[in-house]
Amino acid sequence: MPLSLFPQETPDSTKNTIQAAPDTSTAAEKPLEHFVPVPDRWRSIVPPPYELYVKGKGHNPYYQNPLKGDYPIWGQNTFLILTGVLESFMEFSQVPVPSGVSTSNPGSFKFFGEGERLALNETGKFSLELYHGQTAYRPRDWELKVTAVFNINYLNLRENNGVNINPRKGDNRTDQHLGFQELALEKKLFDLSTRYDFVSIRAGIQRFGSDFRAFIFNDNNLAVRLFGNFGGNKYQYNFIYLPMLEKETNSELNTVFHDREQDVFIANLYKHDFGVLGYTTQLSFHYNNDKASTHYDENGRPVRPAPIGLIREHEIKAYYLGWAGDGHFGRINITHALYHVFGDDDFNQIAGRKIDVSAQMAALELSLDKDWMRFKVSGFYASGDNDPLDDRGQGFDAIIDQPFFAGGPFSYWQQQGLGLTGVALVHKFSFLPTLRTNKLEGQPNFVNPGLLLLNAGYEAELTPKLKLLMNVNHLRFVSTESLEHFLNQPGINNNIGVDYSLGLIFRPFLNNNIICNFGAAGLTPFEGFEDIFETNQTQFSSFLSLALTY
């Protein structure tokens, strides 16, 4: 059994009136008189009687206990962490909603009907993490991670066909689903050096984000991942293959046993302190093979192939080359990304033919910290297709993006999914106007208008418990020709509008056990938005979320 050294309390010299003779022995000759071997450093050491280090209780997460990995459950190096999370979400928004043929309101002649929407979402997560190794520094020898998730959601619209393709289902829906968001086993293969450089493999359902801001891929899905570091942790790398699982439509959880007919491969390399201290750069390669298939979502809507143009199954092979970075140069914080995608779509439905893909994306954020405040400016560009009928797809699309950029989930444009006929202009938690049916279940579309976004933002730590986020975005299409062809509507303007948002993050106990988020956002339409959605009324949304972690 391994031994550890623990400092013992020394006698109080004031209690002994006899003076000891001076110690003339050298340091090498002195025994370790103040240290004794301890066979079990986790349980044999009794905490002192004062309150700061009281002995743990199993039901209290603020005390030390073996259920959250403070003590090993077996031997000296096997730990168990149990975590429960309850997330509540409520949102009210004004969103253009297609009314369909069977409108719920008599006399509704416009294509877009009443847009008020109420969404409620309750999610319970239970996570088990069993691992062998040390609690810090050294990579774990092996790990088992299981996260089961139960979701119940409610959606209320003012129009039929919005919650289900069958108008007899009405204008509201309640649904529930149970799935696994993590079910993976990790094993360290070998060490590369005495500085904890290592190579490990993880197989199963796991979470993976391919860059700093999730511009291309961010998902929980089935995968085999080889990862590690070298050079004293100055270099980190990932090789990951994902035979994608199908998603449940309304909860967006994994279905576990249904193949998505899509293969994704990602390789990336990180270099810390590149050029200057505090700046990390990344090179990446993504491969997306979205195979030809037919699929209907849980609400009866066709999502593969998309119900637009010439409907035919088609296969997409796309290759992404990327360079990204995150860090700071002096006082200036910087995040940037640059991607080029190429490949082919053997039958694009808008073009009505095979197309060769060639599109680009660029993003840059600069910020400056002053005391408890941060001032930000950023820009985002995704190329658009200016000729939807030729044999080139020049509109940029991602695999599964979820960017926290320019306001992220607090902004109206990224928070709301704006629907059109059979497809969506933009999807929830994305700002790419891609004209695809569904970000998770639909196929990428590289014949799209693209986007130019300019942002100014402000963040403030108002108190140690309360954080404020404010953002203003100007949105503009790069090329509207694909929209004009798809909607059979000439003369669509490039200007979308101005998106402004406010967010509050409240942590009452200065930790992540309780997190309360509030967001309010609006979009003032310009000519392009009005041309598409037939309204110049300011759109709005607000949400409140609460996350409890035990």
Residue map of PLM features:
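N-terminal periplasmic/intermembrane-space "pro-region" immediately following the signal or transit peptide
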Residues: L3-R140, D371, F375, F404
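Outer-membrane beta-barrel channel domains
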Residues: K30-V38, Y63-G75, P98-G100, S104-H258, ...
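Outer-membrane beta-barrel transmembrane strands
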Residues: Y50-F79, E87-E91, E114-E122, G204, ...
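Short loop/turn motifs that connect adjacent beta-strands in outer-membrane beta-barrel proteins
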Residues: Y53-L82, S93-V97, Y131-L144, L189-V199, ...
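Extended hydrophobic secondary-structure segments that form protein cores and membrane-embedded regions
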Residues: L82-V85, W142-N151, V199-Q206, Q282-Y287, ...
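Solvent-exposed loop segments that connect transmembrane elements
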Residues: S102-F109, N160-V163, T249-V256, A292-R312, ...
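Signature for the C-terminal beta-barrel architecture of outer-membrane proteins
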Residues: R195-F198, Q206-G393, L452-L454, E461-L462, ...
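Exposed, low-structure sequence patches enriched in small/polar residues
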Residues: A382, Q416-P490, N495-L502, F506, ...
